[in-house]
């Protein structure tokens, strides 16, 4: 197949071949050869039709280009599709895991997996790779030819595996420049293992079990470009005494071995500039020979026991940096006379690291007299308690001085009276509580001063007098409680001020006003609760302000006044909280016209409800971080002012089962947004068209939510989308996700991470979303749905009509039996208690008590006893029984009919029971009173009432007052002359 590829490459360069664009996002690629009417000569041979046919067949027979957007174990990096990440995916079968990775991939990261073996031709389809990372696996075997085909690879990382020996495994890596084999179990390396690596520059074999340095030399001696060889933390004891030469080597590290000698007499390293032999056991190295290292510029002997008398200064004339730190104090400090004798004969020495070696201030004086240094590191010398007597007078050229991690508690200006050229001073991790006046005044050119991690409680501004050139001051992790406007008056040129990790609680008006040139101010990890108005006034050049990890909860009106050039504002992890979306009288950021980045992450109780004009004034903002808030409620157009926003992160806002709330039109004004992250928010659904205005969106991440369906409306108008991440959701294998399944598998523009591993989230299902059979979704169920729905509607209508009739009949039958029994009992056992039971609706109650009751129960004419619901029903008895008793104990039933009466179920029941009594007794016991005209069709559902109207006489309430006496006369006549017997005149009155 490789021969066929070469033919295709030659053809691509021919003007007679038209190539359909090799779009690596297609499933297949092919070549179409245009047939020329005349024979064309190519390399002395005729281009015949048979060859044309062969080439077309070859084009179609080549392995298909992998489907780019649906990997199982891997994902493309969201900002560069040429970078593929397969991290922490429990990969064991390498070939299967990377089979679907596109050919154009240049960077492949397979770290933190469970790969054990690299078989031959493992990466043959990834010839474009330049960076391959396989660290943190369990690789113990690399077969011959495993990397064949990777001619473009420049970096190979095999760190933290279980490789024990290195054989002929690197064939084909002709462009490799960096090979990392550290943290393995290598004991043996074949002499020809690295021969193919003709361009290798850096080889790391640190933290293995190598003891044979000769074997290493034999394996690397043929590498013409090797510059760096790292053998840190092995078990090498002796160097090779066979004549060898590594001409290109510039850096060699034996750090952390067990060297007994430093004899390079047989090894020619003419271009070696850096040699590290630090931490090499407890035994004294006596055999030292460095003559063959004429270009040596840096020598690290820290933690190595060596007799300095054996170091010949004449062989180190080009040495510029030397580390003589004493990490093993069991052998005592170095003799200062011996040190001075050596250093005094190194004319080019500029840097000396002398940690844990100086016993006191006198030792510094002695050391300073024998050298002319530019950088001196005296850190971690626990015997240094104070400096006050011109200890550095003999080092007037010194530019950098490190005194960190000592026990210093006192200094004065005499300490560095001669250090006129000092630009950097590190006094961190000491025991300074304060400094005397003018302590640093001689340091006219000092640009960097670190006082971090000292127990300083307050700042004496006079101590810093004279530091007019200072550009960076580090006061982090001290015990500072208060600062005021006098604290920084001595720093007119200060650009960076770090006050982080202190105990500052309040910032007063004008505290930083003298710092006109300050560009970066760090106040994170303090106890700030109150920021007075104009706390930052005067900082007209401030670019970055860090207020993270404090206790800020609100902002004064003029807090950020004067910060016209502020680009970065960090307010994360405070207590900023709002409880309403009402408009703020003073929007906090309205004057930050140039702000580019705003961090509001992790407010202790969540921002909760973001006010509607909270972001007013931030027209230049490009990056907004709102994630890690327990609660964020965005129900207005809060983002409308952010017209230039390109990155928005609202991830990690879930609080228990509560999810992030987003208004449907929240994003409508973010026309330039490119990156949107809504990860880990408990989102269960998305509002259609919510994101349709984000036409510039390129990266959209919704991973680790509870989404079940993704449909077309969610991604509508996202024309620039390149990366869409919904990994870790609960997508269901239903027809609702049919569009997403088909789109994600066929899109050529958008990458969906780990698409091929999305499981179906139905209980008991083991299938994947991409395997979902969508045949049932394509079946036209319209007619079936129509017939089913039509049948259901028809059945419902018939059943409703039938059930209404049946229920009425059942009730009718039930109460016929009951009425028959009760009526018979009343007839034989008791007399009537009432002349009439009045059946009326609650709406007509006023008419009954105002007109009917007075007319029939009161007055000089014949009166009647009426039974009324609220007055005469017996409490505690079932309402059905009360109605039945009222009808049975009354001679007649008065039905007061109105439109309201027809809609009352209780009235319907009363009519039915009265009809049963009429049916049983064969007497005219029902009197109908119509309060208003009612059309006949409205009585259709009241079939029994309709029948009564047809058979019985009814009386209508007259509109005219003059006709009402006649109306009542007719009612009395209908009720009859007979009244209730006197022995039954007692009434049951209900309050």
From Swiss-Prot:
Extracellular-side segments: 69-783
Membrane spanning stretches: 784-804
Record-level Gene Ontology MF annotations: identical protein binding; NAD+ nucleosidase activity, cyclic ADP-ribose generating; rRNA binding
Domain TIR: 832-975
Subcellular location: Endosome membrane
Signal peptide: 1-68
Membrane topology (Cytoplasmic): 805-991
Chief place where the protein resides: membrane
Keyword Repeat: yes
Membrane topology classification: Single-pass type I membrane protein
GO terms for cellular component: cytoplasm; endosome; endosome membrane
Subunit structure: Binds MYD88 via their respective TIR domains. Interacts with UNC93B1.
Similarity field: Belongs to the Toll-like receptor family.
Record-given protein name: Toll-like receptor 13
Taxonomic source organism: Mus musculus (Mouse)
């Amino acid at each position: 197949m490789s021969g066929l590829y070469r033919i295709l490459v030659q053809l691509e360069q021919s003007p007679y071949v038209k190539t359909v664009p090799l779009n690596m996002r297609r499933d297949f690629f092919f070549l179409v050869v245009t047939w020329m009417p005349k024979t064309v000569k190519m390399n002395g041979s005729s281009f015949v039709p048979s060859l044309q046919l062969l080439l077309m067949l070859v084009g179609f027979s080549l392995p298909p280009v992998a489907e780019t957007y649906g990997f199982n174990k891997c994902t493309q990096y969201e900002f560069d599709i040429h970078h593929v990440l397969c991290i922490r995916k429990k990969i064991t079968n390498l070939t299967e895991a990377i089979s679907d990775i596109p050919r154009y991939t240049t960077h492949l990261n397979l770290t933190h997996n469970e790969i054990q073996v690299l078989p031959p031709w493992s990466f043959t389809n990834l010839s474009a790779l330049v960076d391959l990372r396989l660290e943190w696996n369990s690789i113990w075997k690399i077969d011959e030819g495993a990397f064949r085909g990777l001619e473009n690879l420049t970096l190979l990382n095999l760190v933290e595996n279980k490789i024990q020996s290195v054989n002929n495994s690197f064939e084909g890596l002709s462009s490799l420049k960096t090979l990392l084999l550290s943290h393995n179990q290598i004991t043996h390396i074949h002499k020809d293992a690295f021969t193919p690596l003709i361009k290798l520059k850096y080889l790391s074999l640190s933290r293995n079990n190598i003891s044979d340095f000769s074997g290493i030399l034999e394996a690397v001696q043929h590498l013409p470009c090797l510059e760096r060889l790292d053998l840190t933390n092995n078990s090498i004891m002796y160097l090779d005494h066979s004549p060898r030469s590594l001409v290109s080597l510039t850096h060699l590290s034996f750090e952390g071995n067990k060297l007994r000698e430093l004899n390079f007499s047989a090894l020619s390293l003419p271009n070696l500039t850096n040699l590290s032999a630090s931490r090499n056991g407890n035994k004294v190295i006596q055999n030292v020979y460095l003559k063959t290292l004429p270009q040596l510029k840096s020598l690290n002997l820290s933690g190595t026991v060596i007799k300095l008398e054996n170091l010949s200064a004449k062989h180190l004339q080009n040495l510029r940096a030397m580390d003589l730190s004493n990490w093993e104090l069991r052998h005592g400090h170095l003799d200062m006379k011996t040190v001075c004798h050596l250093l005094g004969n190194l004319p080019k020495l500029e840097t000396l690291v002398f940690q844990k070696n100086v016993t006191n201030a006198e030792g510094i004086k002695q050391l300073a007299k024998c050298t002319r240094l530019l950088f001196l590191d005296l850190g971690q010398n626990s015997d240094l308690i104070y400096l006050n007597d011109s200890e550095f007078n003999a080092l007037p050229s010194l530019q950098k001085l490190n005194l960190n991690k000592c026990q210093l508690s006192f200094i004065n200006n005499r300490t560095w009276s001669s250090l006129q050229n000092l630009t950097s001073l590190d006094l961190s991790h000491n025991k300074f509580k304060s400094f005397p006046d003018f302590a640093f005044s001689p340091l006219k050119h000092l640009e960097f001063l670190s006082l971090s991690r000292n127990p300083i409680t307050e700042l004496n501004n006079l101590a810093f007098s004279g530091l007019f050139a200072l550009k960076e001051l580090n006061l982090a992790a001290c015990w500072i409680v208060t600062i005021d406007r006098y604290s920084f008056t001595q720093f007119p040129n200060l650009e960076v001020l770090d006050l982080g990790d202190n105990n500052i609680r309040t910032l007063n008006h004008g505290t930083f006003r003298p710092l006109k040139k300050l560009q970066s101010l760090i106040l994170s990890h303090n106890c700030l609760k109150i920021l007075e108005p104009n706390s930052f006034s005067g900082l007209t050049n401030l670019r970055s302000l860090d207020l993270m990890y404090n206790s800020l909860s609100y902002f004064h009106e003029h807090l950020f006044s004067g910060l016209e050039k502020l680009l970065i504002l960090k307010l994360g992890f405070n207590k900023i909280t709002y409880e309403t979306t009402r408009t703020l009288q003073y929007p906090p950021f309205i004057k930050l016209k140039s702000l580019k980045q705003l961090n509001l992450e992790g407010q202790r109780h969540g921002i909760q409800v973001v006010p509607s004009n909270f972001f007013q004034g931030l027209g230049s903002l490009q990056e907004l971080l709102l994630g890690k808030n327990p609660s964020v409620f965005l129900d207005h157009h809060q983002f409308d002012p952010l017209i230039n926003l390109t990155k928005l992160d609202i991830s990690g806002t879930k609080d228990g089962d509560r999810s992030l709330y987003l208004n449907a039109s929240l994003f409508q004004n973010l026309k330039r947004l490119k990156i949107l992250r809504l990860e880990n928010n408990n989102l269960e659904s998305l509002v259609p068209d919510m994101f349709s205005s984000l036409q510039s969106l390129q990266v959209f991440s919704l991973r680790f939510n509870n989404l079940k369906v993704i449909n077309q409306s969610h991604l509508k108008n996202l024309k620039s989308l390149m990366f869409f991440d919904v990994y870790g959701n609960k997508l269901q294998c239903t027809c609702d996700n049919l569009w997403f399944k088909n789109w994600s598998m066929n899109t050529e523009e958008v990458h969906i991470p780990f698409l091929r591993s999305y499981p179906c989230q139905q209980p008991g299902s083991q299938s994947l979303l991409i395997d979902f059979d969508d045949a049932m979704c394509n079946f036209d169920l319209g007619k079936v749905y129509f017939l089913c729905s039509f049948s259901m509607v028809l059945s419902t209508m018939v059943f409703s009509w039938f059930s209404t009739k049946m229920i009425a009949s059942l009730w009718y039958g039930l109460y016929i039996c009951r009425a028959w029994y009760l009526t018979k009992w009343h007839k034989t056992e008791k007399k009537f208690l009432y002349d009439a039971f009045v059946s009326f609706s609650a709406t007509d109650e006023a008419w009954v008590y105002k007109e009917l009751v007075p007319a029939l129960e009161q007055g000089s004419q014949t009166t009647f006893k009426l039974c009324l619901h609220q007055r005469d029903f017996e409490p505690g008895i079932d309402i059905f029984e009360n109605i039945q008793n009222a009808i049975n104990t009354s001679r007649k039933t008065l039905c007061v009919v109105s439109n309201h009466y027809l809609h009352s179920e209780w009235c319907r029941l009363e009519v039915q029971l009265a009809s049963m009594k009429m049916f049983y007794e064969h007497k005219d016991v029902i009197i109908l009173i119509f309060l208003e005209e009612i059309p006949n069709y409205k009585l259709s559902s009241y079939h029994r009432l309709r029948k009564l109207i047809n058979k019985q006489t009814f009386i209508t309430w007259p509109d005219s007052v003059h006709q009402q006496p006649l109306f009542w006369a007719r009612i009395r006549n209908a009720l009859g002359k007979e009244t209730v017997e006197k022995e039954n005149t007692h009434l049951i009155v209900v309050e």
